[in-house]
Amino acid sequence: MRCPACNYNGTKVLDSRPVQDFGSIRRRRECESCGYRFTTFEMVEQTPLIIVKKDGTRDEFNRDKILRGLVRACEKRPISIEQLETVVSRVEKTLRATAQHEIPSEQVGRLVLNELASVDEVAYVRFASVYKQFKDINVFFQELSELMERHQDTEQENQT
């Protein structure tokens, strides 16, 4: 690595530590020529995730778009923005773990719903109504029934 002060191409690493939540490493360096100390950050370059929409068009994965949808679904609910950012981070982490570069939008929606169900059931129903585009009240009731079953299963697991 070149020294930013004297442009010498030799530095030694004095300290190296991970940076939380950013997947990067902070390194404290010292120039072997002039002794100048500086900090660098090293991070893995992520390949972009491509979301394939229902109509076949492709868009790059956008955390902000998911977060905006979650904020709308959680209006007037006791849910912090930090909780919603955690949902988005978990969804993105799961998507990246699949090692696929193109992911159907339906898969993204299912992941968001699964994460949201554990945060707030009302927000889950609101998000599901937009994501699943309920055509009539029967589909809405079916979704509510599935959510109630999942809730009861979770309660039973917590009691054992």
Curated annotation (Swiss-Prot):
Residues 49-139 form the ATP-cone domain. The gene is nrdR. GO terms for biological process: negative regulation of DNA-templated transcription. Binds 1 zinc ion. One of its GO terms (molecular function) is DNA binding. This is Transcriptional repressor NrdR. A zinc finger (unnamed) spans 3-34. Negatively regulates transcription of bacterial ribonucleotide reductase nrd genes and operons by binding to NrdR-boxes. Its cofactor is Zn(2+). Belongs to the NrdR family. Keywords: ATP-binding, DNA-binding, Metal-binding, Nucleotide-binding, Repressor, Transcription, Transcription regulation, Zinc, Zinc-finger. Pfam families: ATP-cone, Zn_ribbon_NrdR.
